[in-house]
Amino acid sequence: MKSFMDENFLLSTDTAKILYHDYAKNKPIFDYHCHLNPREVAENRQFNDLAEIWLEGDHYKWRALRTAGVPEELITGKATNYQKYLAWAKTVPLCIGNPIYHWTHLELRRPFGITNMLFNPQNAEKIWHQCNEMLQQPEFSARGIMQKMNVKLVGTTDDPIDSLQYHQAIKNDESFDIDVVPSWRPDKVFKIELPQFNDYLVQLSEIADVDIYTFADLKKALLKRLEYFDAQGCKSADHGMEIVRFSAIPDESVLNSILQKRLQNQPLLEEEVAQFSTAILVWLASEYCKRHWVMQMHIGAIRNNNSRMFALLGADSGFDSIGDRAYAYPLSRLLDAMDKENQLPKTILYCLNPRDNEMIASMIGNFQGDGIAGKIQFGSGWWFNDQKDGMERQLQQLSQLGLLSQFVGMLTDSRSFLSYTRHEYFRRILCEMIGGWVEKGEAPNDISLLGKMIEDICFNNAKNYFK
């Protein structure tokens, strides 16, 4: 019987162990998509206690707590941090079988070095004091943890109207050698159907100093913000797409009419929504190309399902789930519309429903080219899929329908400074899969060849892709 989460956790073959320990383990982390607050990096936040760094804003843990019957007061309510922490300690033993159980223990091991005890009510007080003592030390500040975890770059997620003042402050600080770059997230612009669209355009108009009455005005305002983001080191644009729409792009006069209807709070037809979003996205893609940005699309979530809790807590509080809309055809047409004028940028497609894995893995092959290795990527298992089975499925299906060797690898997609251990989880799963191929005679026992492939997937490919 193997020990629980020992140094060879998830590694069952000799080849897998060699690939992980000699090639994957010590590669730096290139975390090209996350939701860290750049202010916390700029100000080098020192966390007061373990609950603050561990439970604050982590909707994965919040969902587990609710499922275990913990009152909301002890999750997002006014209970003390220690009370919330104890509720988490009681919940974790109930999570066996869920990746949260593994993540929790990985997060205690790195960076805190706690390897000799399980997280449960019996050990909770000891772990609390031990970790809190470390959290008061400079090397366990926000920046300190990033450095301990060997992070080289993080790409945050930022609205076009964000000031990016904290990115600028980090960039100007020569004492800190980790790149923290913004990523453009224009969801509130291309989703004309959102109730807050008009209010958002007022904000965009103010920050860009452009009156927005026409489609040309909107592009002018966005162009100013694109240039500003580019000057701040932006390398990527991300798009949350609950629905993938496509319609032939009409004349600009039609787009002006659609925009005017929306500004006057008149209801739009679904066709008009699709025409507008297609026009904006295709134009944005051409601008990304000019700046050599990567375009990311996160497809298929159903957000804010629980209207009562949304009213209480707002978005990103643990009430989202997997959607099941069919979108292969509109996605194909949208990418093709971008590609027709050779204005399809490097692109990463993520699907939330694993049903769509093979569809996405085959779709990316339609638009490869331009002498760019892995120009169009099937993104790593996202959200509900960034667990063992989900990662294995994505890796296997990418390898079967594409080129695994060109994959840009893992990302945290997280708001937590402790989530870098997800890269370790991914790397172990990757090495186990490839090591298994060798043991079964399905891949050559050429460690130098496979080791380079592992190093590329863990770091080198992403570094080269996000230039």
Swiss-Prot record:
EC top class, as a word:
isomerase
For this protein, the record's InterPro entries field holds: Metal_Hydrolase, Uronate_isomerase
* Keywords, comma-separated and alphabetical: Isomerase
Q: Which GO terms describe its molecular function?
A: glucuronate isomerase activity
Picking any one GO biological process from the record gives: D-galacturonate catabolic process
- One Pfam family recorded for the sequence: UxaC
Tagged with keyword Mitochondrion: no
Q: What is its EC number?
A: 5.3.1.12
Q: In which pathway does it act?
A: Carbohydrate metabolism; pentose and glucuronate interconversion
Xref: HAMAP family? UxaC
Protein name as it appears in the record = Uronate isomerase
From the broadest rank down, the organism's phylogenetic lineage runs: Bacteria, Pseudomonadati, Pseudomonadota, Gammaproteobacteria, Pasteurellales
Q: Which gene encodes it?
A: uxaC
